[in-house]
Amino acid sequence: WAVKRQKYGEKIWWCDNIGSKYPYPNWYIDEPAINHRIQFWMAFKYKIDAIFSWGANVWGGYKAGENDKWPYQPWNAMTYPGANGDGYQLYPGIDKTPYSSIRLEVIRDGIEDYEYIYILREKLKELKKARKGENMVAATESLLDFSSLITSLVKFTANPEELFRRREMIALQIEKIDKILK
């Protein structure tokens, strides 16, 4: 569907918000961390142009008084029932410094994964254009095939080690291609 719309010049975005619930991966507190990270691999596989998050520091519902907010009052992570943590990826510190959540750090890892994948795809194009390393083309294309990791939008690996291994293999392949292209 996305590719068809993109042929008309449209950009396709995913939005992770209160509506995206199990079995779809999302950024809620009670979901496994791989669900936060796999979305970027899916975006590459399904040719999605962007992932939109409506908020990272939506700390609404708190009184204006200085001592009426967290950490002086209990934190209410249930601002959106059924979507725990939606809009909360940064948390306010006592000194008003924002603190990163583990989820935000996993999301960052997913963004970095996407960058590695993107770089490898671009290196593959260079390799083909230069007509070098023909034996590397198939291996590179195989690394960019995520069918063993993602079979649908709701069926994907639950094992983070598979993503770690694939990312490492992608990084090594980038280095190998760079040596060939020099």
Q: Where are the language model's segments positioned?
A:
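Catalytic-core regions of glycoside hydrolase
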Residues: W1-K63
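Catalytic domains of carbohydrate-active enzymes that cleave complex glycans
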Residues: A64-K182
